[in-house]
Amino acid sequence: MSNVIEGNDSNFENDVLKSDIPVLVDFWAPWCGPCKAVAPVLEEISIEFKDKIKIIKINVDDNQEYAAKYGIQSIPTLLVFNKG
């Protein structure tokens, strides 16, 4: 069972910046081929390390605020946040 969370701009602060454990954020889009290729690996990581790291996917087409804030210019882009 996957533990990957579908995030968005409105929950980014709580789910990512205020998380007690490290968070891997996948900035992606549904039309992106490489994003689709990396998705199964992220699913596996989310299961294997479910209590050690949180994985959140942010669709950049629908959620542009934090993609712009962190300078996301190509996708997929993976960023790790630890304690904000």
Model region roles, listed by residue range:
Residues 4-23, 64:
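A short beta-strand-turn-helix
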Residues 8, 28, 54-56:
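Conserved Rossmann-like nucleotide-binding pocket used by diverse enzymes
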Residues 20-21, 28-31, 74:
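Short pre-active-site segment immediately N-terminal to redox-active cysteine/selenocysteine motifs
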Residues 20-22, 37-58:
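Conserved helix-turn-beta segment immediately C-terminal to the redox Cys motif
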Residues 23-24, 42, 65-66, 76-84:
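A short, hydrophobic beta-strand/beta-hairpin element that forms part of a small beta-sheet core
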Residues 27-41:
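Conserved redox-active cysteine motifs that mediate thiol-disulfide chemistry
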Residues 58-68:
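Structural microenvironment flanking redox-active thiols in thiol-disulfide oxidoreductases
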